[in-house]
Amino acid sequence: METKRVEIPGSVLDDLCSRFILHIPSEERDNAIRVCFQIELAHWFYLDFYMQNTPGLSQCGIRDFAKAVFSHCPFLLPEGEDVEKVLDEWKEYKMGVPTYGAIILDETLENVLLVQGYLAKSGWGFPKGKVNKEEAPHDCAAREVFEETGFDIKDYICKDDYIELRINDQLARLYIIPGIPKDTKFNPKTRREIRNIEWFSIEKLPCHRNDMTPKSKLGLAPNKFFMAIPFIRPLRDWLSRRFGDSSDSDNGFSSTGSTPAKPTVEKLSRTKFRHSQQLFPDGSPGDQWVKHRQPLQQKPYNNHSEMSDLLKGKKCEKKLHPRKLQDNFETDAVYDLPSSNEDQLLEHAEGQPVACNGHCKFPFSSRAFLSFKFDHNAIMKILDL
């Protein structure tokens, strides 16, 4: 079925071609891929200015616009080349260009900033864009985020803190920017590229395309977040690791250990955001799949004095001299407890592990092992072939 051709006035195409295409060097003008990039710039100008100031003009996508330009200036198309083939090659080339951007988190680390494209069917995603020639990744991320949100992350960005994925053979790296106030004013610097900028609760965003969480909690289908979905699970892993280094009860983990618990104001006041700090201490930057620390299954103690009494009792029972350990083989274990610090939590009588705040030694000997003896006759029978 033949598609309807977009009608753009010749005067408009003349102006756009003179602005963006005809002035480029001849060696670039002979390269159809390079011409397509210039046509893309002309298309943005057409949407930003002509569409806004000239009623009645046809709104069109980049493919239809490029066809109109090649039809208006056929000398731009290499001899014998098909327009559709050139556009397909250009699309494939663009997919190989890395994209850089940022994941902006609020002060509670519960919400993330997403942007929505200008077109009606556009979904929500993180602010990012393609890198320019000889542009550093972090500079590209700062430029794209500023263009799409009006917020400058140059003073917040850390070159080593990012999540990096390869999606359909295209590299995408998002730098993590935590601690941005929710009342920050965002305003896109480009026309007709970003329609909306909003904070979203991370726990309400989908981890995969069949995750119906946003449908039930936001009233939005999961495909509205298809650009953000690949980064949600790595982001949750990052949050788990961020608050998983403490061994106390306020360690930021939920009871399951699979998703981070909501950080409290008190906790965040203790956590200073140092953007030069390595946020992936146990893996390389951008390593998004992390193994969660398993919370210790420990027997609760009602108060400090209860634990202290227990430890004192243990020390009274196990006062052993290093040279007389043989006299105590009937006991189950040997505890070498530092007597000067009762704040160190040790293993109690039933063998249930608890957290240890200091350096504790646990020389342990099994009763079965200590009474073990080789059966010499049985061994010799085996060797007697």
Swiss-Prot record:
This protein's cofactor list reads: Mn(2+); Mg(2+)
Q: Name one GO cellular component term.
A: P-body
The note describing how and how many cofactors are bound reads: Mn(2+) ion is required for highest activity. Can also utilize magnesium ions.
The residue numbers the entry assigns to motif Nudix box are: 129-150
Task: Quickly give the catalysed reaction.
Answer: a 5'-end (N(7)-methyl 5'-triphosphoguanosine)-ribonucleoside in mRNA + H2O = N(7)-methyl-GDP + a 5'-end phospho-ribonucleoside in mRNA + 2 H(+)
Q: Which annotated residues bind Mn(2+)?
A: E144, E148
Region (Disordered), start-end ranges: 247-266
Keywords, A to Z, come to: Cytoplasm, Hydrolase, Manganese, Metal-binding, Nonsense-mediated mRNA decay, Nucleus, Phosphoprotein, RNA-binding
Similarity annotation: Belongs to the Nudix hydrolase family. DCP2 subfamily.
The molecule here is called: m7GpppN-mRNA hydrolase
The organism that produces this protein has a lineage beginning with: Eukaryota, Metazoa, Chordata, Craniata, Vertebrata
